[in-house]
């Protein structure tokens, strides 16, 4: 369970402390998650570089991009101004490209699995948040609008976390 304030907003130290120490801790945790997953799936085993914030994150917002993997320098880059809850999954997503998983759906699934390896509830939440859109779309296709509306009432508390890009 992710701690929330009385307004339903997620409480997390990195939300107030956007220092390089907190972001470094988050990047280190993303690497640790991928390495834990690598113990289970040998294709994901090995060294991972530290995910780096993109200098042009504002441009990435305009393109609705959460990250970018640059294979020639082996850099996993993430959008530094996106909503905090999306950063763990975005970091793991970009790191999964390092292991040759170039298709976005594969990288998304690996990021989801990696985030669940963490003891940090924010990482776990980010992993679940990263796949909720796929689940909602599949539910709509399989069950229709009425069932979707009923399901959305159950997942209403996630609304605040569905924001990919911040306002500022």
Regions found by a protein language model. Give the residues of each.
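Extracytoplasmic
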Residues: 71-75, 83-87
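A cross-kingdom signal targeting lumenal/periplasmic-facing segments of multi-pass membrane
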Residues: 56-60, 77, 164-168
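Contiguous, non-catalytic segments that form substrate-binding/exosite surfaces or channel walls
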Residues: 1-74
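Active-site recognition of the HExxH zinc-binding catalytic motif
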Residues: 89-101, 105-108, 112-113
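Long, well-structured alpha-helical subdomains associated
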Residues: 121-168
């Amino acid at each position: 369970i992710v701690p929330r304030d009385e307004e339903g907003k997620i409480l997390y130290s990195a939300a107030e402390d956007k220092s390089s120490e907190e972001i470094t801790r988050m990047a280190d945790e993303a690497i640790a998650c991928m390495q834990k997953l690598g113990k289970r799936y040998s294709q994901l085993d090995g060294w991972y570089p530290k995910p780096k914030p993109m200098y042009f994150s504002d441009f990435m917002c305009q393109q609705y991009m959460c990250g970018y993997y640059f294979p020639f320098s082996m850099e996993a880059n993430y959008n530094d101004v996106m909503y905090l809850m999306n950063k763990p999954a975005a970091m793991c997503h970009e790191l999964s490209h390092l292991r040759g998983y170039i298709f976005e759906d594969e990288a998304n699934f690996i990021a989801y699995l990696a985030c669940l390896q963490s003891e940090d509830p924010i990482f776990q939440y980010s992993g679940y948040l990263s796949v909720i859109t796929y689940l909602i779309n599949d539910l709509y296709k399989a069950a229709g609008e009425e069932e979707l509306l009923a399901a959305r009432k159950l997942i209403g508390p996630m609304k605040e976390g569905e924001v990919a890009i911040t306002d500022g």
